[in-house]
Curated annotation (Swiss-Prot):
GO molecular function per UniProt: calcium ion binding; calcium-dependent phospholipid binding; phosphatidylserine binding
Renumbered ranges of Annexin repeats: 17-88, 89-160, 171-243, 247-318
A Pfam family this chain is assigned to: Annexin
PANTHER family per UniProt: ANNEXIN, ANNEXIN A10
Gene that produces this protein: ANXA10
GO cellular component: cytoplasm; nucleus; plasma membrane; vesicle membrane
Annotated protein name in UniProt: Annexin A10
Keywords in alphabetical order: Annexin, Repeat
Family, similarity comment: Belongs to the annexin family.
Species of the source: Homo sapiens (Human)
InterPro entries per UniProt: Annexin (IPR001464), Annexin_repeat (IPR018502), Annexin_repeat_CS (IPR018252), Annexin_sf (IPR037104), ANX10 (IPR008156)
Amino acid sequence: MFCGDYVQGTIFPAPNFNPIMDAQMLGGALQGFDCDKDMLINILTQRCNAQRMMIAEAYQSMYGRDLIGDMREQLSDHFKDVMAGLMYPPPLYDAHELWHAMKGVGTDENCLIEILASRTNGEIFQMREAYCLQYSNNLQEDIYSETSGHFRDTLMNLVQGTREEGYTDPAMAAQDAMVLWEACQQKTGEHKTMLQMILCNKSYQQLRLVFQEFQNISGQDMVDAINECYDGYFQELLVAIVLCVRDKPAYFAYRLYSAIHDFGFHNKTVIRILIARSEIDLLTIRKRYKERYGKSLFHDIRNFASGHYKKALLAICAGDAEDY
């Protein structure tokens, strides 16, 4: 288990930052028929999110236009999604991804699982606020209308953002482990509710104790037990929560590997994780990826993506010396 070590992103504040100069250069890059995509990559992937917000403000003042809007007009395909995605503040980016996961034909349940299983209380609160401001909709109401069953109940619990923080009680851990064991045996609606209540509301520290107690009681790993007892999106969501509790960077490494190798490069997932984790733990995710899968994330992106889209992803991902 790697829950205690230091995590780190790949994008940091640029030294000697000048938002007016950056805005001018972006304005020049976006002029004309064939825009300078390399310039966009070199500037926007080498500035932290707060600096990008300042660039967008300077751009608006300078040209009277919205930088995201201009990029959406000038760029295309997945490259456009990366460049535009970099220009959202993190809570709004999560809100944007959730909105698009639920609107239109079908629901992208995997996006809902990935975001809501992995975000902190503070991130969830800010995401709900951003969702309401941007779309004039209530995130909880949209989740309720677009999902169903115990999957919906668990998402609704997570989106409250009321997980306990930093609290452990070994005696309660033993009791909760017994409840989880019974829930995996009985599988009634009531047991499913108790299962998701524990996984959604107990602190990460407490849940690590619970999972150890569960192993002692049942002789089985928590993830294996869930996979054996449940199915569908409810099962996938429960597993995602357990994996995030144990080692969040390893969870994202797993998501990236699956997106790259199991689904013929699932672009939305790769873009979302690289952008969302770039200033949080992407460097640590890279380490987990290489430890677990033998190849670097940089190597796999380079092999599966192409063109300026590939350049942008690799600039966000960055790499170790041997990757270049």
